[in-house]
């Protein structure tokens, strides 16, 4: 017996020494008994040795199979290890690849692996769940595959452009190789490498093609079983066994019987023709089926195992008498599994709805129905266990409908009393002779509904149509709150009424009442009778409503939080409707600014929003100083967006962990409540400009002048640093350019920078009364430019006519007279008014520019001398021997003892 049957061929022994191929698993049994299985004719057959191409390609395909298995289980570490081995194996097969070309299956795995890694990289949630090794391997492998694929860029591009064609070519090549290997000596290469790679299903109709491929494989296997042992099917059978990952005995793998007679050759040729014909028939049949499927429409993905007809769950056994006790018992059974792990919340809601239907069909009374509906609404709220997750649209609509149905029932049956203080043991659900008592709190349901609505608005893209659709639901929310308010006014306690009033206030305070505003602009005499009747039918104005609700809370509330929120909302509403003095007085009388730092964050956000609205209201009234003071704290911090609850800053995100960030995001106000930050900053900067520019001109020579607004000075310094100044584009650049013009007393240029088309679109048109605001701004710019002009050029004039000033700044003469008189009274301008000639006579008491410089130099020299003397005393051992209150101590030769600064007392001689 030849040693070949036990040791294998020479080429195989060499490849096994290299350690690069997979080690074959020995089959149970002794190799020595293997020849007994062979016939006498097969002992003389020609031994066929596998080529180097087959061995190299088999090694590549085995590694590819391992990589794909690792991809399925998301084992990136294994993918990295096998990819490195794959690169080494490809390098050893380089000589074969240079002759044959890059195999398609190799290009496919490179493209698929790169796409797979990109998907993992983009999946942020999946990356967080990865362990440390997989995350590190993902980063490393992604870099390696991107670098490695540069050499195969053209091949990968061709494959991605037509992946189906490449897959068909592989299949055809596989068939040709498997058929060619059955001949006697026609092809020495034997099996093609593509035979070891599974065909990748197409993106469309995956399941259909997969089943058809399995049917083809079954038919091929049946054909091979019908063939005799002495035909060329040995090679194809071994190929199929290798594709299935089964290692066979080397002796049986490489044995092959060669046809010896012409009859055998003809029989083999005939069988090959029959096999090719069968394959052609199957292929044509498959194409016909695909055409029929395509005519029927696209394939639809369905969930396996889900029945098409979903049966309703059975609540009670057949023949069970439906009574109050049975229904309550079933309700308790459903509620017992509530919140447990593995509970289907949607099914629980369906069971409760079915229970309501059963109770109504059996006329069990409204008491049972009300109790079940309370639990349905509570189950809807508990559908999402995560606090940050908001309700789905269908669940939200179901919740609104359930609350409306519950309110209809409670309003229609006045004998039903609900409350949290009612114990379950003392409930009365079926005794209609007495008032029905049900445990539950309608106020809690409405508050939770309001919170869910806020959560929906927080998690919806504010610039999408979906946000607008959700915002339309606020009308239903407000209607439900109003119904509950009327219900609680009749049957609720004082605390409950205060809470529902606050909910009504929170949905009213930020809305501008345009109808009431129009009625204020139009006098009653000018409106027709129909318009007056329509105004009466519309109900009370928002101002009257806010006054009534807030006053009740002021008088009845016992908690500081509800009263504080009501006061802030009332102030906000006053400021929004330009009632400055009412808003200011209410803020000052409440003393909220003294202890607001002790309030919880949502109340602090409401306080900040109220102060901002108060400042904007003062600006609209022309009170620039009050506006600046109200906005100073918010704008000077540089965190206006965060303080107003309109977003989180990137720099602050690094200071808090993930849980704190989630809590902060839940505190954000919805987008429709936002205050325009650009408008806010513009109001602040313009107010600062109107205050700061005249002050800078009046104290130009004062080295110790204070800054009114640091942010405004910062913007001025930024503008001065620009090497090339073009026309202003942003809002800040417009304000800086206007400030420079106001410094020169050029009010027209300042006006053109503040009020133009660009600034109107960004800021001024956003005000309810935009024309009034623009008129006020022009007036303020003229007045402050006049003050700046007098401060800057007072040293130039001996006297100046007020008529000239009136013409220069287009102000009427009484206004100019009033401004100059105030400046003289406040000792800002050293001048006097000559009434007969209507002129301003300058007194020249202020130093000139040269004198100011000399005074500054003298002051600096004096401070330098004092510092030098103090240093000298310190070196001589004097400790604090010179004090600021001891003026001219050295100049008058008053002695100082060198003992800690104790002044020597001169002895007085008595005469």
UniProtKB/Swiss-Prot annotation:
The PCI domain, residue ranges: 671-847
Does the entry feature the keyword Cytoplasm, yes or no?
yes
Could you cite one Gene Ontology molecular function of this protein?
ribosome binding
Highest taxon in the source lineage: Eukaryota
What Pfam families is this protein classified in?
A: eIF-3c_N, PCI
Cite the residue spans of the region called Disordered: 1-44, 154-299, 520-540, 883-911
Alphabetically sorted, this entry's keywords are: Acetylation, Cytoplasm, Initiation factor, Phosphoprotein, Protein biosynthesis
What protein name applies here? Eukaryotic translation initiation factor 3 subunit C
Per the record, the gene is: Eif3c
């Amino acid at each position: 017996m030849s040693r070949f049957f036990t040791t294998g061929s020479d080429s195989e022994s060499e490849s096994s020494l290299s350690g690069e191929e997979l080690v074959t698993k020995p089959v149970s049994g002794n190799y020595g008994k293997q020849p007994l299985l062979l016939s006498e004719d097969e002992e003389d057959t020609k031994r066929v040795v596998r080529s180097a191409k087959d061995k190299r390609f088999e090694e590549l395909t085995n590694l590819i199979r391992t990589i794909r298995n690792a991809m399925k289980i998301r084992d990136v570490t294994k993918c990295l290890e096998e990819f490195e081995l794959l690169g080494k194996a490809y390098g050893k097969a380089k000589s074969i690849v240079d002759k044959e070309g890059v195999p398609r299956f190799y290009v496919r795995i490179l493209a698929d692996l790169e796409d797979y890694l990109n998907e993992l990289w983009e999946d942020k949630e999946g990356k967080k769940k990865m362990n440390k090794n997989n995350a590190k391997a993902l980063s490393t492998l992604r870099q390696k595959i991107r670098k490695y694929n540069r050499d195969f860029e053209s091949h990968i591009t061709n494959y991605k452009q037509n992946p189906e064609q490449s897959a068909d070519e592989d299949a055809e090549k596989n068939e040709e190789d498997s058929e060619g290997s059955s001949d006697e000596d026609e092809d020495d290469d034997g099996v093609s490498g593509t035979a070891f790679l599974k065909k990748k299903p197409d993106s469309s109709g995956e399941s259909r093609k997969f089943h058809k491929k399995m049917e083809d494989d079954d038919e091929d296997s049946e054909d091979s079983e019908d063939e005799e042992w002495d035909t060329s099917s040995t090679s194809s059978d071994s190929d199929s066994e290798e594709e299935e990952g089964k290692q066979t005995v080397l002796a049986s793998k490489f044995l092959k019987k060669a046809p010896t007679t012409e009859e055998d050759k003809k029989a083999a040729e005939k069988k090959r023709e029959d096999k090719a014909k069968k394959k052609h028939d199957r292929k044509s049949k498959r194409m016909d089926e695909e055409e029929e499927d395509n005519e029927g429409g696209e394939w639809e993905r369905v969930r396996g195992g889900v029945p098409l007809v979903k049966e309703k769950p059975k609540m009670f056994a057949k023949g069970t008498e439906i009574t109050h006790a049975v229904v309550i018992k079933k309700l308790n059974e459903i509620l017992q599994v509530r919140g447990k792990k593995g509970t289907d919340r949607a099914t629980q809601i369906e069971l409760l709805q079915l229970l309501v239907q059963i109770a109504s069909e059996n006329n069990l009374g409204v008491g049972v129905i009300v109790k079940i509906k309370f639990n349905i609404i509570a189950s809807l709220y508990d559908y999402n266990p995560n606090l940050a997750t908001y309700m789905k649209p269908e669940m939200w609509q179901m919740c609104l409908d359930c609350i409306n149905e519950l309110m209809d029932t409670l309003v229609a049956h006045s004998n039903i009393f609900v409350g949290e203080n009612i114990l379950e043991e003392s409930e009365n659900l079926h005794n209609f002779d007495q008032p029905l008592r049900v445990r539950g709190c309608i106020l809690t349901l409405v508050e939770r509904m309001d919170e869910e609505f806020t959560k929906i608005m927080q998690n919806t893209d504010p610039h999408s149509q979906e946000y607008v659709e959700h915002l339309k639901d606020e009308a239903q929310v407000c209607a439900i709150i109003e119904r509950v308010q009327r219900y609680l006014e009749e049957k609720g306690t004082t605390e409950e009424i205060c809470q529902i009033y606050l909910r009504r206030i929170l949905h009213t305070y930020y809305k501008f009442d345009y109808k009431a505003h129009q009625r204020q602009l139009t006098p009653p005499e000018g409106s027709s009778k129909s318009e007056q009747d329509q105004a009466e039918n519309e109900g009370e104005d928002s101002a009257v409503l806010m006054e009534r609700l807030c006053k009740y809370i002021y008088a009845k509330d016992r908690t500081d939080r509800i009263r504080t929120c009501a006061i802030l909302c009332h102030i906000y509403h006053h400021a929004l409707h330009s009632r400055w003095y009412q808003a200011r007085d209410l803020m000052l009388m409440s003393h909220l600014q003294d202890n607001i730092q002790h309030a919880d964050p949502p109340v602090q956000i409401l306080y900040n929003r109220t102060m901002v609205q108060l400042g904007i209201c003062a600006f609209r009234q022309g009170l620039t100083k009050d506006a600046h003071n109200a906005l100073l704290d918010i704008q000077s911090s540089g965190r206006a967006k965060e303080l107003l609850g309109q977003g989180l800053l990137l720099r602050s995100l690094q200071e808090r962990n993930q849980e704190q960030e989630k809590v902060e995001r839940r505190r954000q106000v919805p987008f429709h409540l936002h205050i325009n930050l650009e408008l806010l900053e513009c109001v602040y900067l313009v107010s600062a400009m109107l205050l700061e520019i005249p002050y800078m001109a009046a104290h130009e020579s004062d080295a110790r002048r204070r800054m009114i607004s640091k942010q405004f000075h910062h913007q001025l310094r930024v503008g001065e640093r620009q090497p090339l100044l073009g026309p202003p584009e942003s809002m800040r650049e417009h304000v800086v350019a206007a400030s420079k013009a106001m410094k020169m007393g050029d009010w027209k240029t300042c006006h053109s920078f503040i009020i133009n088309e660009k600034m109107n679109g960004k800021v001024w048109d956003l005000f309810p009364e935009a024309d009034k605001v623009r008129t006020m701004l022009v007036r303020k710019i003229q007045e402050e430019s006049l003050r700046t002009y007098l401060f800057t050029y007072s040293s130039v004039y001996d006297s100046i006519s007020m008529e000239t000033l009136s013409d220069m700044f287009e102000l009427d003469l009484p206004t100019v007279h009033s401004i100059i008189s105030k400046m003289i009274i406040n000792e800002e301008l050293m001048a006097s008014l000559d009434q007969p000639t209507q002129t301003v006579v300058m007194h020249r008491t202020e130093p000139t520019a040269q004198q100011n410089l000399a005074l500054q130099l003298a002051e600096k020299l004096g401070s330098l001398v004092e510092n030098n003397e103090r240093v000298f005393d310190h070196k001589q051992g004097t400790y604090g021997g010179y004090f600021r209150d001891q003026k001219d101590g050295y100049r008058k030769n008053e002695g100082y003892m060198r003992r800690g600064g104790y002044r020597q007392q001169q002895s007085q001689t008595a005469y």
